[in-house]
Amino acid sequence: MDTSCVHMLLSLLALLQLVAAGSSPGPDAIPRGCPSHCHCELDGRMLLRVDCSDLGLSELPSNLSVFTSYLDLSMNNISQLPASLLHRLCFLEELRLAGNALTHIPKGAFTGLHSLKVLMLQNNQLRQVPEEALQNLRSLQSLRLDANHISYVPPSCFSGLHSLRHLWLDDNALTDVPVQAFRSLSALQAMTLALNKIHHIADYAFGNLSSLVVLHLHNNRIHSLGKKCFDGLHSLETLDLNYNNLDEFPTAIKTLSNLKELGFHSNNIRSIPERAFVGNPSLITIHFYDNPIQFVGVSAFQHLPELRTLTLNGASHITEFPHLTGTATLESLTLTGAKISSLPQAVCDQLPNLQVLDLSYNLLEDLPSLSGCQKLQKIDLRHNEIYEIKGSTFQQLFNLRSLNLAWNKIAIIHPNAFSTLPSLIKLDLSSNLLSSFPVTGLHGLTHLKLTGNRALQSLIPSANFPELKIIEMPSAYQCCAFGGCENVYKISNQWNKDDGNSVDDLHKKDAGLFQVQDERDLEDFLLDFEEDLKALHSVQCSPSPGPFKPCEHLFGSWLIRIGVWTTAVLALSCNALVALTVFRTPLYISSIKLLIGVIAVVDILMGVSSAVLAAVDAFTFGRFAQHGAWWEDGIGCQIVGFLSIFASESSIFLLTLAALERGFSVKCSSKFEVKAPLFSLRAIVLLCVLLALTIATIPLLGGSKYNASPLCLPLPFGEPSTTGYMVALVLLNSLCFLIMTIAYTKLYCSLEKGELENLWDCSMVKHIALLLFANCILYCPVAFLSFSSLLNLTFISPDVIKFILLVIVPLPSCLNPLLYIVFNPHFKEDMGSLGKHTRFWMRSKHASLLSINSDDVEKRSCESTQALVSFTHASIAYDLPSTSGASPAYPMTESCHLSSVAFVPCL
């Protein structure tokens, strides 16, 4: 049948279709010729769009309408495409066969598809381009063959495709460019050969593709290019050679006079020669970052009048800023990761249209005046070596909106450095060496970063930044001026209270509130609430203040304040009294008294640390934000934290030693054994002190730091090193308490009933037991706090944590001496002995100053001697049990060098 007959038949069929469609079908009616399970809709009045995608079909539907203009058979299981099955679809313009299992397409499969414009065959199992099936599809404009396994392209497979504009051959297994197959595609405009295995591009590989505009060759294995491989591509505007193995600069691009966008980043190119782009005057964008570039010709980027974007990242061997003469239209310049140490003074004369300047990760030390770059909108100079910002550096940059100077060594900024930047909204000066910050001209800022400048401790008034939305400061105290932590705390508390109520309760509460208040009260209430919300949401400042970074009061509550003052006063006074009675008494100091005296001395240090914190709270009362950063970073906070940890650990270690000493002493006394010499005990005491000193020094060496909070204590939460340090302390101290408990349990179990009361110094045994019990009870909250932070248990409120750290932790330092003063009879005896000794010393001193006769002198001397003998005789005691039948194990004489511990009844 000839062509004229075919056209007549088609016209007749169209007329019959129109007659059959005499009345419009309803919106839900299924058009005629629609296969079952497929979705069909009209395309105009005659043509039909058929969607049979993702139905699990294994073959083509047989009852397709001849007026089908769109057929989607993608995502099925079709493995064969019979010849001539689609030949009736002469109106078909788009055929989708993607995502099937096609391995071969026979000749004649697309015969009769004279109107076909789009053919999609991607995501199949094709191993070569169909040799004859695609020929003579004269209307075909777009062909997708990507994501197959194609390794061979027959030379004549594309013959007759005179209208083909777009060809996808990416994500296949091609090893070479199919030069012969492309010779018939003179109308081709865009082609991608990306994601293949191409190693080399031969000369004239695209010689006949004179209309090609876009060519993608990225993600191949290309390591070399023919010197004339791009000859013939007279219309090429975009060339993508990214992610290949190129070792040399692609000099073949010199013939691409219309090239506008060039990408060859992520290769192995080590140098860019002089006048590298001399044949590409139309270049607008160049991307060649992530190459190990060691050399860039000074004139490489000259005379590119259309160049808009230049990006060079990771060129670590570039030390000189490139000359950009004749590239005056450059708008974006990115040269990062190099070793550029200076900029030419005339950089803005060469780049008057520059809008984005990114020179981050270089070695810039000084900056020229950039006032000539009037169009600059963004400057990124982070991670350089800049020390000073001069007044002329950024002058009159009226369009500058973003300035990043983070991670430099900036210590000096001219007071007017930012005074002529009216459009600046983002400024980043984080991680520098600033001690002051100029605010002139920054009233339009919305984002400000100053974090990492530890020397910048002064408060910055919020009135200088009326438009500010986000700010990052070196310390939380500087955020107190931007929002007020009191408002945040008040609103959050109110919301927390309401969280526990049901919706009905809240409605009732609101209704009652409105009924009780008159209009004036309601307006005042709403105004206050709006002010609170404004204060809460106006500025997002970080790090935000909180219970451990307070704005007004260090201690927060009066309960903590009174507790700290009470602890400090009692610890200082009572421990001083105990130490005085122990070390200043004329009597011999026994081993247990030595331990009690040393414990009193270290508890004085704990009292000193609490007293210093109390003094800081009093000095900064109501205005702690002004002094918080100074206090945290100062030596005073380090000393307070060191003394606190040292005193706490020393007290526990010495108490453990006292418990062991009592057990050993009772054992020796019951067996009439000689006790260990006092020298050995002193050595062990020194060892305990050195161990506590080592533990207290660890935070000073790094990791867990004392200045993490104004409380000057390693908090049991936050950084893992801090948590680990606190947990290690808890485990060590728990071990000490366990040893003490075992020692005393063994001691009591080894004694028969009533035997303890007969011991010569049972009051000291009971006293150490009382200290053990009290200290163990007080340490339980500390241990629980540390382990709860380790387990991420967050139900403990900050006020409770502060109370434990500030009151419970130092409480043993005042409780230990109080227990000794109130309950231990040795204290009364020591006080009496100290009083007698003091009175005797005063009388002796008074007598030496008077001039009296010899009789009076002899009389007074005799009385004094009698008093001394009487006193010494009354104070003699022995380190052996006072049993009637036992004789001393060694000779004893009443000498001042003998052990002198008074016998005291066991209470």
UniProtKB/Swiss-Prot annotation:
Coiled coil: none annotated. SUPFAM superfamilies: Family A G protein-coupled receptor-like, L domain-like. Residues 25-66 form the LRRNT domain. Gene3D superfamilies: Rhodopsin 7-helix transmembrane proteins (1.20.1070.10), Ribonuclease Inhibitor (3.80.10.10). Identified in a complex composed of RNF43, LGR5 and RSPO1. Also interacts with other R-spondin ligands, including RSPO2, RSPO3 and RSPO4. The keyword Repeat applies. Residues 1-21 form the signal peptide. The chain crosses the membrane at residues 562-582, 594-614, 639-659, 683-703, 724-744, 768-788, 803-823. It comes from Mus musculus. GO terms for biological process: epithelial cell proliferation involved in renal tubule morphogenesis; G protein-coupled receptor signaling pathway; hair follicle development; inner ear development; oocyte differentiation; positive regulation of canonical Wnt signaling pathway; regulation of cell population proliferation. This is Leucine-rich repeat-containing G-protein coupled receptor 5. Glycans are attached at N63, N77, N208, N792. Receptor for R-spondins that potentiates the canonical Wnt signaling pathway and acts as a stem cell marker of the intestinal epithelium and the hair follicle. Upon binding to R-spondins (RSPO1, RSPO2, RSPO3 or RSPO4), associates with phosphorylated LRP6 and frizzled receptors that are activated by extracellular Wnt receptors, triggering the canonical Wnt signaling pathway to increase expression of target genes. In contrast to classical G-protein coupled receptors, does not activate heterotrimeric G-proteins to transduce the signal. It comes from the Eukaryota. Belongs to the G-protein coupled receptor 1 family.
